[in-house]
Amino acid sequence: TDMSAQNAAAADTVAAVTETITEVVAAPAEEASAAPDTVGELALGLNTVWMLLAAMLVFFMQPGFALVEAGFTRVKNTANILMKNFVDFMFGSLLYWFIGFGLMFGAGGFIGMPHFCDLSFINNGLPTEGFLIFQTVFCATAATIVSGAMAERTKFSMYIVYTIFISVLIYPISGHWTWGGGWLMNGEEGSFMMSHFGTTFHDFAGSTVVHSVGGWIALVGAAILGPRIGKYGKDGKSKAIPGDSLTISALGEFI
């Protein structure tokens, strides 16, 4: 009986030790498997924070544009300039969310497939809502660049038409070519870019999609509209048109 009790106690001890060893060995393995998930979540969080911070900085360009344009134009046109910039961002954001975002990042070579008010089609490893905000402020920037070039010589109603056009078509299509999987970034063998140049087109910070697109449209608009009324006299000589406030314009330039 004593031997049986001793054997039972020994067996219980061995079982307890074995269970403890198993737990000790399994714990690091579980921690190791959980570590990549933790690192991935941390990287996603940092990327999201940085993306939203960059979006905020790009959005801050909007008051900068407004101050520059209001400072360099005459005081009688200040309200018109400020309202254009406000409506530019308001209408542009809504239209880009409803239509432009799908055209920019939908499947397709020349233009993306439309996804009206639908964000479920995109999965790039980032929160879709945050990525939408990031792209929206870029679209608004491309549209607002044109406002200064055509200041004091564009009807308010026609400027709204232009805002709709660039937010729905021009920026989404050019953005699709370079950022949305379009033909300029197609790296497949036999594609246009690879067969002609051996590489794809890269635009890391919007120098082409945002600034060149807005700049070229501004140039075309200024060339079509011509100089401001009163800029040249009957003799063809240029006349100075003093702005409202150099202080305001300087502040806008710094922003």
Locations of the language-model features?
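Hydrophobic alpha-helical transmembrane bundles of multi-pass membrane proteins
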Residues: M3-I255
